[in-house]
Amino acid sequence: SSMTKRIFKKGNIKVLKAWAFYDWANSVYPLVIGTAVFPIYYGTLFVDSDYIEILGFNYKNTALIQHVTSLVFLLLAFLVPLMSGIADFLGNKKSFMKLFVYLGSFSCMGLYFFDLENIYLGLLFYFLALFSFWASLVFYNSYLPDIANPTEQDNVSALGFSYGYVGSVILLLFNLFMINFPASFGFEDSNQGSVEAMKVSFLTVGFWWIFFSQYTFHHLPSLKNNVSEKELLKKSILFSGFKKLISVWRL
């Protein structure tokens, strides 16, 4: 309706800043979990042996996590065009973005339980966190042309990048301090205390991601398409997703 068009005029500074602020919320995942802490924590699980049996196969620990990571990107390549086709059609990018933010955040928290006894559950949380992080970015980035004029897009992206850099470094420093001085945070003053602090750092990432993304969700417009039920029946939602998938693979 013209009413909604008037409210969501492109270039609203508050909306643009709220969009950029999502980088502050999510950048803690690739830095703290992806790069700094999780690889070290994962290594501590395999002090006795580098090999583990999964589904009857003997895996080297590094190969195992690489296989799971590859599977995530394989699925993303197939599912993301499908999901963004559906989101474009229904006009509910925000719902998709929220879904992956919540799924990703809770999966980060779930990494607290990642150990050799719970290896399947741990790998599932690792998988879901990585998948959700990248999937949320797809919907996040597709918002930009809807809310920013072409001339503003570079600046808003750069603002997001700087928010993300500062936010993730703050949380990383806090977690590194906790891991290196576990006794100051109520953990044992030992290697075991540091390992426990690493697990708690996964909880902090999940909490940070979910907490700070609320500001973004509050200000981002829903951009609902006014899709009548008749139109929905005429145009299959799934077909819209598949068309997009095919066009992406043709490139």
Model regions and ranges:
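Helix-loop boundary and gating motifs at the non-cytosolic
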Residues: R6-F73, L123
